[in-house]
């Protein structure tokens, strides 16, 4: 009789994905983030489900229902702050995961990479809609500003904005539909994650050397299950420390003021994980230009496979490209800082320079450097 995990139609799929999966023997801790993102997604769905049981998607009671969750529901404060800070952890891991993909040339798995970029867009949309739900000042004005960007689309823009709002301003209809989308999108994300894994398992994992590892594979379990559990414990430690000691560290104080359409907050800004894109949006004085730059700042990831000029896959043995990538990381940190600053001198100039640098590094300097490294190696 064959082993049940190898013969049962359902368990067989799990076996091929998480147990007997042939995995390169040399993948580092940078490969932990995929599983951590999966855990984050599950955590967000579970905490979100419990929050949805007590939340009311109505402009008059939304803010009060959040207060009720934090004060009256058993461990409601814990569920609420785990959900909020869990989103921050999600984005930290997403950016690490993408950074690892760029560093080690994982984007050469075209299907996996492109599904990943679509996933990033979907997660960003979900997080934005979740930010609107507490119906504080930043929720209302954030929703107003970001949805208003669509009015920059020629011809159909203004009509599209009113259609999304369900009226002539951000109101009850907007909140209700945002709640509906925020609830359903994580399940769509889960389905897309499965497709992401399906494409990954067609090719097998990349590894730090960027070389073919078919000759040196080990089973995923127990080697990488135990390694993933270590990552999971470190993640839970960080998340719980953040949630229990300083739950509002990454948030905005304006969230605690109920939404008021007659009073604009001094600085409208999104959560920290969108600030780099927000800085790029603000650095262009033209509305349509800003929106295009915002979209392209993420969509540019789709171009990485086409712009890979090096004859080596990974950056492990390419010091010049490594330097450039770390300059890009520093540049993104500067953009994140600028996104949270008021629109005044010298922040405007710094933001514009950092935005230009961002696109120049990716579109011009990285391919040129790769080409140069090929020449240096006489290839």
From Swiss-Prot:
It is a multi-pass membrane protein. A ubiquinone binds at residue 201. GO terms for cellular component: mitochondrial inner membrane; respiratory chain complex III. It holds the Pfam family Cytochrom_B_C. SUPFAM superfamilies: a domain/subunit of cytochrome bc1 complex (Ubiquinol-cytochrome c reductase), Transmembrane di-heme cytochromes. It is found in: Mitochondrion inner membrane. Its main location: mitochondrion. The chain crosses the membrane at residues 33-53, 77-98, 113-133, 178-198, 226-246, 288-308, 320-340, 347-367. The keyword Transmembrane applies. Binds 2 heme b groups non-covalently. Heme b b566 binds at residues 97, 196. Component of the ubiquinol-cytochrome c reductase complex (complex III or cytochrome b-c1 complex) that is part of the mitochondrial respiratory chain. The b-c1 complex mediates electron transfer from ubiquinol to cytochrome c. Contributes to the generation of a proton gradient across the mitochondrial membrane that is then used for ATP synthesis. The cytochrome bc1 complex contains 11 subunits: 3 respiratory subunits (MT-CYB, CYC1 and UQCRFS1), 2 core proteins (UQCRC1 and UQCRC2) and 6 low-molecular weight proteins (UQCRH/QCR6, UQCRB/QCR7, UQCRQ/QCR8, UQCR10/QCR9, UQCR11/QCR10 and a cleavage product of UQCRFS1). This cytochrome bc1 complex then forms a dimer. This is Cytochrome b. It comes from Proechimys cuvieri (Cuvier's spiny rat).
């Amino acid at each position: 009789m064959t082993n049940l995990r190898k013969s049962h139609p359902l368990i067989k799929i799990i076996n091929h994905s998480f147990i007997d999966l042939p995995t390169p023997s040399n993948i580092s801790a940078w490969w932990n983030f995929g599983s951590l993102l999966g855990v984050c997604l599950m955590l967000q769905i579970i905490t979100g489900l419990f929050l949805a049981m007590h939340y009311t998607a109505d402009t008059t009671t939304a803010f009060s229902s959040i207060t009720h969750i934090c004060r009256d529901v058993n461990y409601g404060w814990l569920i609420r702050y785990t959900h909020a800070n869990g989103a921050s952890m999600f984005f930290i891991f997403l950016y690490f995961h993408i950074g690892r993909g760029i560093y080690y040339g994982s984007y050469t798995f075209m299907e996996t990479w492109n599904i990943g970029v679509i996933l990033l867009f979907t997660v960003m949309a979900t997080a934005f809609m979740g930010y609107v739900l507490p119906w504080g000042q930043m929720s209302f004005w954030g929703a107003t500003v970001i949805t208003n960007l669509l009015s920059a689309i020629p011809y159909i823009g203004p009509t599209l904005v009113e259609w999304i709002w369900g009226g002539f301003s951000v109101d009850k209809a907007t909140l209700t539909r945002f709640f509906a989308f925020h609830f359903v999108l994580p399940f769509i994300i889960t389905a897309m994650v499965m497709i992401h894994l399906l494409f990954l398992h067609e090719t097998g994992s990349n590894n730090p050397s960027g070389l073919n590892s078919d000759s040196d594979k080990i089973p995923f379990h127990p080697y990488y299950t135990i390694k993933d559990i270590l990552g999971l414990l470190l993640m839970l430690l960080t998340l719980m420390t953040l949630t229990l000691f300083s739950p509002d560290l990454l948030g905005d104080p304006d969230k605690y003021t109920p939404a008021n359409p007659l009073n604009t907050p001094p600085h409208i800004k999104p959560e920290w994980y969108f600030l780099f894109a927000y800085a790029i949006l603000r650095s262009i004085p033209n509305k349509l230009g800003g929106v295009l730059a915002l979209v392209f700042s993420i969509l540019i990831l789709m171009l990485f496979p086409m712009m890979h000029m090096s004859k080596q896959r990974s950056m492990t043995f390419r010091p010049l490209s490594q330097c450039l990538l770390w300059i890009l990381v520093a540049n993104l940190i500067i953009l994140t800082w600028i996104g949270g600053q008021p629109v005044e001198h010298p922040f405007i100039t710094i933001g514009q320079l950092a935005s230009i640098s961002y696109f120049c590094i990716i579109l011009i300097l990285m391919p040129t450097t790769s080409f140069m490294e090929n020449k240096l190696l006489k290839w």
